Amino acid sequence: VNIAQGIQIIDGANTGTIDVNVDDSAGAILSELTEVSGGTNLDELTSLTVTAGVVDISSAADLQDITSYDASNSSYTISDTAGAILGDTGTVIDDGVSTINVNGPVGAGVGVQLGALEDASFETGYSADINFNVVDDANDITAALTGDTTGLDNAASLVASSGTVTVTEASDIQGVAEYDSGASSYTISDSADAVLTASNESTILNDGVSGVVVTDATGAGYVDASDGEALSELEGLLQTATNDSAADIEFRVEDDAAAIAAVLSGNNGGALDGANDLEVTGGTTTMVGAADIQSSGAYDAANSSYTITDTAGAILGDTATAIDDDGVSHIIVDGKVG
């Protein structure tokens, strides 16, 4: 019978023992539940099965306190805040609770606790799934994953909303089962070696990575022209992966004129445009090499110093490159002139 019928049967009984088994929703049962001396008005039922419904922790505790409550045949949902759920785990871990919904997103640390609670529920032989979403700074997520990179695998979704982490830490975040790259946005900060290691490329080229800072190639640090070319290419791939033309790999390039010109030669003039700064630190190049250097979007003429060596005809044919550039410190004319 349902709860209303069960109440009528109990109220109408005058003598003897009557077996009354009630099956009804949580809401219907709670609407009839009242406290009486020594218990509740539903304790006289032979059995009480909660067949469905969504209740908060407090109401779930009220249901479970009814003497006739049949946990093994019940199935209902608890929906409440993370604090309420973690504050009364005894009510949560119950055979009759089929699902637990956590209201709103939670931080990474709370997510680990909720995941552990779900595991504990399964270990008791129950099968309640705790549905929760984690939204937190990448640094806090990394801290929560320290020592156990599976600590957030029970989350329904994981969003790294900001923050800066290393390549290894980013890999840990991306390894979480329900990591949501499309909703994430954070920065990777690491050495050029780490960023350019082939096995790390998939971690760098992730939709959730908004940018990369090459730690030993910023400030006074730098990479050479060859690594600069590789980083520029990686930046283009990152922009494609994230569908964001503003996605940036931050790095500086310093090298001699010959090395830079070699990277920029032919149709490769934009090979170092991904650099935030390109400084020529000496060396010698031809007029063509100098023109390639000066055409780079990252070229820093004011802080460069190099020599052009070429024929008189080549030099006189492009005086803007030879004379009008702050980075050209010397010009050497090859051969004799008339």
Describe the predicted segments one by one:
Residues 1-338:
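Solvent-exposed, low-complexity segments and loops of surface/extracellular structural proteins
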